[in-house]
Amino acid sequence: MAGKKPSHRAFKVADQIQRDLTQLLARLKDPRLGLVTLQGVEISPDYAHAKVFFSLLTGTPEQTQAALDQAAGFLRNGLFKRLQIHTVPTLHFVFDRSCERAADMNALIAKAVSTRAKED
């Protein structure tokens, strides 16, 4: 069943998990956590696992991932209290490098535009 599209309910649950995790993260006092932004959540069809994609404004990805992994039990417990589903997924945090790649692409485009302007 590889490639099966997630159901509408799975999207709704993933969205709710993202909103609830954002609120729960605000309560964490771990100094290793910088300014974390949750970019999205992908949930498995059986709701057993959730990949939580995050990006950073401050801090290092390694330290932040370690802090999030350590807080995963607390966060899952918080989700258990908030969600109205039978199985609360195990949380797997993944650093989302798409923001970094977008910034790199913007820098390359700006460099190309300035080089072309100098040639003209």
UniProtKB/Swiss-Prot annotation:
Signal peptide: none
Compartmental location: Cytoplasm
GO biological process: maturation of SSU-rRNA
Gene Ontology, cellular component aspect: cytosol
Functional note: One of several proteins that assist in the late maturation steps of the functional core of the 30S ribosomal subunit. Associates with free 30S ribosomal subunits (but not with 30S subunits that are part of 70S ribosomes or polysomes). Required for efficient processing of 16S rRNA. May interact with the 5'-terminal helix region of 16S rRNA.
Similarity section: Belongs to the RbfA family.
Protein name per Swiss-Prot or TrEMBL: Ribosome-binding factor A
Organism: Verminephrobacter eiseniae (strain EF01-2)
